[in-house]
Amino acid sequence: MDELFHVSERKSTIGTELRAGLTSFLAMAYIIAVNPAVLSGAGIDAGALACATCLGAGIMTICMGIFANRPLACASGLGVNAMIAGITTTVCGGDWHVAMSVIFLEGVVILLLVLCGLREAIMDAIPVVLRHAISVGLGLFIAMIGLCDAGIITAGAGTLVGLGDITSPTFIVGIISILVTVALACRNVPGSLLIGIVVAVIAGIPLGVTQAPTGIIAPLDFSSIGGPIADAGGVPAIVKVLTDPALLVISFSLLMSDFFDTMGTAMAVAKQGEFLTDDGNVENIKEILIVDSAAAAVGGFMGVSSITTFVESTSGAADGGRTGLTSVTAGVLFILAAFFSPIVTIVSSAATCGALVYVGYLMMSEASEIDWSDVSQGFPAFMIVAGVPFTYSISAGIGLGFIAYVIVALFKGEASKIKPLMWIAALAFLVYFFVA
């Protein structure tokens, strides 16, 4: 196993990789309960969704570990699932098979773009300063997710955001999670992120945040699988998507989101996992992008929305994960969760707050690599750093930075220095913003 995953070569140990895989899994486990809750509104059986969510995440995370050998984990993406639930009733005539076919088509197209080298080429064309900014923006985004999930940050009364109710049980569990994680990290205790999650889960029991499981074993239900080939008015659902302009526009919008979300996530995890080169390139990026693109199509076929590389993967990398063994461990746990999902869902999102906030802190170090005194570098970087958390969208934040970079270069008379693919990406984002 050491030789297969190059564990010793990357200055890690099998024990560290297994622990990091468990940390990633626990940081992502909330999706097992949340994804069915969101998509069941589209008419899909919740039990089938829980089963397929676990299996889809498990299979594609294992694939990521084996083929890319990097500590990234995959699962159904939030945001996209809510959009799919919405278009099922508004655009797809209540037929969720058609909605999942939109995801399937988007995944296939992205996979083709990766195989022909376009996605990797665009990533290589991103200026180094924007790569640093993406890591910082992702750090703030991850911290925002953790703080919001724990109710520490909430919608304010008369303001966009505000401090949550400090007497709320979820607030208290979130604070405990942060304090334990930081205290252990200060003492360089191995597995501080994982311990922080476990302590918070235990602390949540008397506070009523950690709910007792409704059972132990969940029956397997595969009825959500096969949406694109299901009948939709006399034709396969995928055919209906290909012949409907409105659905094709939605597929393009999802494609842009997936296209750049994974780029940002890969850079963030690469920084924590120490596989980001000095010039800002992600090692094994082609393999990562191939698996991620295939995962989107697999998610559509399994009826669980787009499966994508999870930004919470940074928690496993921050906990010492350096190889694909971390991913394989998380993937196996997801597959086991298909049988024991009632137990897994006791891990509340508030319990993972400390891990996410601490990872966000670690990623802020990239800000020192940006020359803030140069407006042509600092302003586009700032648009990404501010845009990602404030729009609550990785792709939207990256798009704002790309467009700002091109505009500032035009103002300075340095348009000739911009690589052609950056022009294409900026124009694509303009179209995306109008379409979305």
Language-model segments: what does each one mean?
Residues 43-62:
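Loop-to-helix transition at the N-terminal end of transmembrane alpha-helices
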Residues 60-72, 182-188, 253-261, 292-302, ...:
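Transmembrane alpha-helix interface/packing and boundary motifs in multi-pass membrane proteins
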Residues 18, 38, 122, 191, ...:
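Residue-level signature of catalytic and energy-coupling elements of molecular machines
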Residues 92-206, 210, 328-436:
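Membrane-embedded alpha-helical modules
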Residues 1-48, 161-163, 195-286, 430-431:
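Helix-loop-helix hairpins and the membrane-proximal interhelical loops
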Residues 71, 201, 205, 320:
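Conserved, well-structured core segments that form the ligand-binding/active-site neighborhood
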Residues 1-35, 56, 76-86, 90-138, ...:
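Helix-loop-helix junctions within the multi-pass membrane cores of secondary transporters/permeases
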Residues 51, 101-104, 252, 290, ...:
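Internal alpha-helical transmembrane segments of multi-pass membrane proteins, especially GPCRs
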